[in-house]
Amino acid sequence: MEHEFWQKKWASNVIGFHLPDTNPILTQYWSALEPKRNETVFVPLCGKSMDLDWLAERHNSVTGVELSQIAVRAFFAERLYTPTVTQLSSTLELYEFDEFTIYSGDYFVAPIEAADLIYDRAALVALPKEMREEYVQVLRSRLKEGGRILLVTLDYDQNEMAGPPFSVPENEVQALFSGMKITRLQRDEADAEHPKIKKGLSRFAEEVWLIES
């Protein structure tokens, strides 16, 4: 994850990856984790996602981490929330408001406590292959024993399109989360009318995974 790349995306408001509403995958498949209200939730590379609101309605503690300070400030400003802000270092800030705890800074160094549940819709696929193993090592360290992950990935021929978002095929998911129980909940194949297929991709699929420690 090149910091400058994502900082520029937010600074210029080129955020096509941001959804204006709750992701339907979250609402459809979160129950597969058998979540409980008192279980803590971690959302890596959270942006200013509406998914955070949906999760906070169902859990007492939702923690996120986001590289872009612009995104974190926008999350609270757009909801008219006034968070408590703590400067942890020259490059890391902590924003807290009710159920929300969001770190503004580097995912790899933010002091995030292990959570019961993790939701990764757009984090793993945002990273190039050479960064994904380290990312998952850190992610696994932030999951409690008995914890569960809801993971969303994409599968396409990486030679046909430059990411992000990047393709993370099934064999890589299996390798990254080796030793954990991995269940594919959905594979949604794009049809001929899908924008990615119209742009020339030979295949494009979105996959949803339940990963249990």
From Swiss-Prot:
Transmembrane segments: none annotated. InterPro entries: SAM-dependent_MTases_sf (IPR029063), Thiopur_S-MeTfrase_Se/Te_detox (IPR022474), Thiopurine_S-MeTrfase (IPR025835), TPMT (IPR008854). GO terms for cellular component: cytoplasm. Its EC number is 2.1.1.67. Keywords: Cytoplasm, Methyltransferase, S-adenosyl-L-methionine, Transferase. One of its GO terms (molecular function) is thiopurine S-methyltransferase activity. This is Thiopurine S-methyltransferase. It comes from Aliivibrio fischeri (strain ATCC 700601 / ES114) (Vibrio fischeri). The gene is tpm.
